[in-house]
Amino acid sequence: MTLVTIKKDTQIAAIHAGIKIGSIYESEKEKGISHFIEHMLFKGTKYRDNETLNRELENLGGEYNAYTDSNSTVCSITVLEEELEKSIEILGDMFQNCLFPQEEIEREREVILSEIRGSKDDLEDYSFKKVNETAFDKSPLKYDTLGNEKIVKSFTRDKFIKFYERYYVPNNCFISIVSDFPHNYVVSIVEKYFKDWLWKEFKREKVLEEKNRFLKKVSYKNNVEQSTVVYLFTLHGLSKKEELALTILSHRLGESGNSVLFRELREKRGFAYDVYTDLDLSPYVKTLYIYTSVGRENVDETLDVINNCIESIKKGSIGFDSNTINLMKKILKTAIAFTLEDVTDIGNYAFHQIIDEENIFQFYEDMKDLDGIKEEDIYNVANKVLNKPTIHILLNQ
């Protein structure tokens, strides 16, 4: 088990406990199983039935949550510091003693099937799924974390138990805890409730890193008021410095109300309410998206605007002078400072750093390295990354 504790002057304790297993490690016949098991963690253990478990979580008086992403399944609890030990004990029970009652499996299967169907009604979410499906041939990024209806319907209790017993082992568990308690005290509590968990060898599926396809695809959907346009770029193999430069570029391109795309598509032309970039630098993911939603009559001009903005940045026509770069640095440093102030945010940050085998003090390095980013670094990474996108356009049927 990997445990990191962060001592902070606070009355709140934030615990993030997770298993390094998510959608990118699932085989084709397992798509959605990590997410399904995340749901089942709350459905009863050897020592607590569903009702008891959820009542005790509620009685902690704080907030609890769970999520599954590309490479992890995570449970988080934020409570008053006096509830730290009880929270750790409950999480220990969930991670070691989940029972998968058949009646709860069937009930939760319907919930997840409803979640999958409902996601198709979310135009934004649906558009991202379609561009991922279009962009990749074999990469796990083409599959949704929820899975699909056919596979979710096929999962058996035996399959859940085998997957749970294979990956829910201490040597695949990562925990971050933020509180006012000293490190040794927190370690003693974790050891108390996880000491009997048996170490076991396991092997994750090898993850394929794949460059996106260079193509444009148009899909159609019934009862759609707006059309969506999504660009996807993959960015494997960048250095840390290039990733920092790309972070500044992404912010300037589409992450603020003064970004290039926002001003061109919304302020100047009134085409879109939503327009933004989304940068994901997670291991094995490494993607940059551009998303907007416009009227069908404006799709062609929107494509021209996005393409022109990209080319203008690559050619240096859209400048990154010292004032612009310094502002971007200030914004990124402010975001880091906000994270450090919030116990839940810093706990989540530390959790993902350790699960990705990164330095938990990387933000200090990033803040220092930001000062070394120059205009040419941004243009260089723009010319390296902003080429041959996958473009998906969704129109009304």
Which residues are covered by each model-predicted region?
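Short, Gly/Pro- and small/polar-rich lid/capping loops
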Residues: 1
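His/Glu-based metal-binding/catalytic segments typifying zinc-dependent metallopeptidases
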Residues: 4-18, 201-260, 394
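Active/ligand-binding-proximal structured segments within catalytic/core domains
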Residues: 7-57, 131, 231, 241-253, ...
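Charge-rich, well-structured scaffold segments of protease-associated domains
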Residues: 52-202, 219, 236-237, 254, ...
